Structures are given as C-alpha cells and as structure tokens.
C-alpha cells in the first residue's frame, strides 16, 4: 500500500485514488482544476521562429488530444512570433490555448502575454538581472 501524501489519498485498492481539490482557473476557454478532469498538455519541439513547422506540429499534437500547447520563448523576438503562430492557428479554427514557456527572460514573458493564453515562468528565473531591486518584506507583499 502506498503511503499517504498530503496531496492525495490512496488505499490498498490501486484504483481508489482521490485527487486533491485544486483551485479552478481558466486558460483561454479551457478550465483547469476544480471538478474538471486532469488536462493533457504537450510541449512543441518545432522552433518557435519556424511558423510553418510550429503550426503543422500544433495541428498534429492537438489532433492527438492535447488541450494546451506549450512553446518555448527564449527572447522577445521569439515571444513576438507566438503572435504569428496564434493568429495562424485561429485562422485555421484551432482555439487550443497556447502557453509560452519562459526561462531567464522577464522581457520575453511580458511580450508573450500579448499573444498567448498563459505564460509559464520559473519564479527563480524571473529576477531583476541588473540587481536594482532591493528585496525586503515590503517588496514581497
């Protein structure tokens, strides 16, 4: 029998798993959490700058069942191209929410917000690279 974990309960019966109740949020028109099922997300491997390849891969991933699709966006130029990808997918009738995956570049995250339904950021990477912010309790509030 698996040990109990704060996020779920288990029993001697392997099929008796109970999900932890999560807050309900909407990513585009696709709800996540609450009483909704676990959602399927996939990460694109096509270059985010190669619009044609990115859109073609999105069609394949979504037809396979993905409910969210993540693209990497390393900098502002790449994040801006998410807008082109988003527009082309919508023109083809595909409304699956797009997620920008950001590492080490707050400017790319801010740019991506203009074009996609969600931005995924590693919090430790979203920092003031010039070190101009003085961190204290007031800043964290």
Residue spans of the language-model regions?
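Alpha/beta enzyme core
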Residues: 3-12, 17-71, 76-98, 102-141
